[in-house]
């Protein structure tokens, strides 16, 4: 079978089996298509290549300047592909099993201080329907720690302003209920009453935060809006990431003494070790404060 056909088979079955988001599947597809192109160029087959071939492919990528993080992501996709091919008997072995992951630098997530978050959230002009929407989105994002994808796809039926909760279908189709708090609930209510009808202009939509065309907003559009407000708030937009408010949500909870397992549940992390990064952020902050203010720091 042709390489690309095998990749398509894997992605279609893996998508259904794991309940992955379209964005995750698209990321796998891009990486594995790059592998497929290299195999075709070198007249190699997914069914017969060996570990040396895979090492050659990864080595070429590193020589071309691809970062270790990119190579690690590629290797992760390859491993899942070859595990599938072995399980489904397209291969008699798994050549990726002997490959080592590149060493990754330990990086703490980017986040904003509480004052920076306050400045950012107070930037939109709430007299303008579009900016009232953005204000509500920013408040909800900081109050709940939702992923950007979860925020822009949030539907009316999955939110109760009256009860102050949102129902989120996260990665792997896992459901979680997250409280939104009074401040976020107030601004969402204001948007629903005064901003959303203007944006919809008589059209219907089941998403809470529609675009100006009454459609679901893209992640990219929301990210551009966040950067716009960051610049207005005199925050270095280049230092931000799309999940900056999610990271701020978690970091500020930990800073104020929240139990790590509660933060894990709110973020929708499967593994507690993923959440533990925020304890490191808190420790780094305490270390800097100690160095700054202690007489022997």
Swiss-Prot record:
Keywords, sorted A to Z: Cell cycle, Cell division, Chromosome partition, Cytoplasm, DNA integration, DNA recombination, DNA-binding
Sequence ranges assigned to domain Core-binding (CB) in this UniProt record: 1-86
GO annotation, cellular component aspect: cytoplasm; Holliday junction resolvase complex
Gene giving rise to this polypeptide: xerD
Function text: Site-specific tyrosine recombinase, which acts by catalyzing the cutting and rejoining of the recombining DNA molecules. The XerC-XerD complex is essential to convert dimers of the bacterial chromosome into monomers to permit their segregation at cell division. It also contributes to the segregational stability of plasmids.
Signal sequence region: none
HAMAP family: Recomb_XerC_XerD (MF_01808), Recomb_XerD (MF_01807)
Quaternary assembly: Forms a cyclic heterotetrameric complex composed of two molecules of XerC and two molecules of XerD.
One Gene Ontology term of the molecular function aspect: DNA binding
Keyword Lipid metabolism attributed: no
Pfam families: Phage_int_SAM_1, Phage_integrase
Disulfide bonds: none
Cellular localisation: Cytoplasm
Keyword Cytoplasm (UniProt): yes
InterPro entries in the record: CB, DNA_brk_join_enz, Integrase-like_cat_sf, Integrase_catalytic, Integrase_recombinase_N, Integrase_SAM-like_N, Recomb_XerD, Tyrosine_recombinase_XerC/XerD
GO biological process: cell division; chromosome segregation; DNA recombination; DNA transposition; resolution of DNA recombination intermediates
Family membership: Belongs to the 'phage' integrase family. XerD subfamily.
The protein, known as: Tyrosine recombinase XerD
Residue ranges occupied by any Tyr recombinase domain in the UniProt entry: 107-291
Residues at the active site: 147, 171, 243, 246, 269, 278 (o-(3'-phospho-dna)-tyrosine intermediate)
């Amino acid at each position: 079978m042709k390489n690309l056909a095998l990749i398509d088979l894997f992605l279609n079955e893996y998508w259904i089996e794991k309940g992955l988001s379209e964005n995750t599947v698209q990321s796998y597809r891009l990486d594995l298509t790059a592998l497929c192109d290299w195999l075709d160029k070198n007249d190699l087959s997914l069914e017969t290549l060996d570990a040396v071939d895979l090492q050659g492919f990864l080595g070429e990528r590193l020589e071309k300047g691809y970062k270790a993080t990119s190579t690690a992501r590629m290797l992760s996709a390859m491993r899942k592909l070859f595990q599938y091919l072995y399980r489904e008997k397209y291969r008699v072995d798994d050549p990726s099993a002997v490959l080592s992951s590149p060493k990754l630098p330990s990086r703490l997530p980017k986040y904003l201080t509480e004052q920076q978050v306050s400045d950012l959230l107070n930037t939109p002009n709430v007299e303008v329907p579009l900016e009232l929407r953005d204000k509500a989105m920013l408040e909800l994002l900081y109050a709940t720690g939702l992923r950007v994808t979860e925020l822009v796809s949030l539907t009316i039926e999955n939110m109760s302003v009256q009860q102050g909760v949102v129902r989120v279908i996260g990665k792997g189709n896992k459901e979680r209920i997250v409280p939104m708090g009074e401040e976020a609930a107030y601004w969402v209510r204001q948007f629903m009453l005064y901003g959303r009808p203007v944006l919809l202009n008589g059209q219907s939509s089941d998403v809470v935060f529609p675009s100006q065309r009454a459609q679901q907003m893209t992640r990219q559009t929301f990210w551009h809006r966040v950067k716009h407000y960051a610049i207005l708030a005199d925050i270095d937009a280049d230092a931000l990431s799309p999940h900056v408010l999610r990271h701020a949500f978690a970091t500020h909870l930990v800073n104020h003494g929240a139990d790590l397992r509660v933060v894990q549940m709110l973020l929708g992390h499967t593994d507690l070790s993923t959440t533990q990064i925020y304890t490191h952020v808190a420790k780094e902050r305490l270390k800097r404060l100690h160095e700054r203010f202690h007489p022997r720091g």
